[in-house]
Structure formats: structure tokens, C-alpha cells
């Protein structure tokens, strides 16, 4: 969506209205502009980190450069394939799921994409 509209929407709604982003890529900027939070794909992989970063941004502190790079890298993890396939594969690599099996209509990640995913996760210290 148009991030410039966050302030406009915030002013038009009551204080009780929860304004959430559905886009991981722009959610930090969305919250910095007054959004309340995000319905996030990435948070399935690193929930506590997303909470920490979200709280920091909403408080006005913003993300440090290394945090912003890590956030971008996490977003990059979930685009190796159609959602939720990369998330499920990542959770398998993290030993959260015992098996990488999917039920239809989902199918297993392509081997090349799976290798890229595990390599990225290893470089980030996630597994």
C-alpha cells in the first residue's frame, strides 16, 4: 500500500482502531509512520526478534544499521518460494517441524531454493 496514507488513515479512525500492515517488506516504515503492527510472515521464523524490532520502531528509536540488514535478510528468506513453503522449510531446518513434508496443494521446496535457504539461515546463525 501507500505508506503516505498511514497518517491520513490514523487521523480518520478512532484511537481504538488497530492499523496493521500485511507487508513484511515495508512494515517497519509503516510502524514508524504510526501503524500499530504487522500481520507477518517473517514472524513465524523469528517471532521474538520481530516483536523486539517492532517495539523499537513504534517507540521511535528506529533500527540500527545491523538490525535493518538482519530484517532485510529475514525478508529475503521468505521469497525463495511461494508462502508458506519457505517458512515451513525454515521451521524444519530449525527443528521446529520434524518433517519438511507438505500437504497438497503445497509441495516441497525445489532443491536449489532449499539449499539457498539453508545457506542463508546458516550465515545468519539461525541453524
What are these regions (language model features)?
Residues 11-17, 94-97, 126:
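Short helix-capping segments at alpha-helix termini
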Residues 28, 89, 119:
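Surface-exposed charge patches
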Residues 54, 90-91, 121:
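Hydrophobic residues within well-ordered, non-membrane alpha-helices that form the packing/core
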Residues 97-127:
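Flexible C-terminal active-site loop/helix
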Amino acid at each position: 500500500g501507500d505508506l503516505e496514507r498511514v497518517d491520513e488513515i490514523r487521523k480518520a479512525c478512532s484511537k481504538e482502531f488497530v492499523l496493521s500492515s500485511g507487508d513484511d517488506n515495508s512494515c517497519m516504515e509503516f510502524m514508524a509512520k504510526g501503524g500499530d503492527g504487522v500481520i507477518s510472515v517473517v514472524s513465524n521464523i523469528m517471532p521474538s526478534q520481530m516483536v523486539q524490532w517492532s517495539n523499537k520502531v513504534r517507540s521511535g528509536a528506529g533500527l540500527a544499521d545491523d538490525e535493518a540488514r538482519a530484517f532485510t535478510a529475514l525478508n529475503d528468506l521468505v521469497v525463495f518460494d511461494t508462502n508458506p513453503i519457505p517458512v515451513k522449510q525454515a521451521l524444519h531446518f530449525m527443528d521446529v517441524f520434524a518433517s519438511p513434508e507438505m500437504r497438497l496443494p503445497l509441495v516441497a521446496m525445489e532443491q536449489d531454493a532449499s539449499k539457498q535457504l539453508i545457506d542463508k539461515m546458516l550465515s545468519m546463525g539461525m541453524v
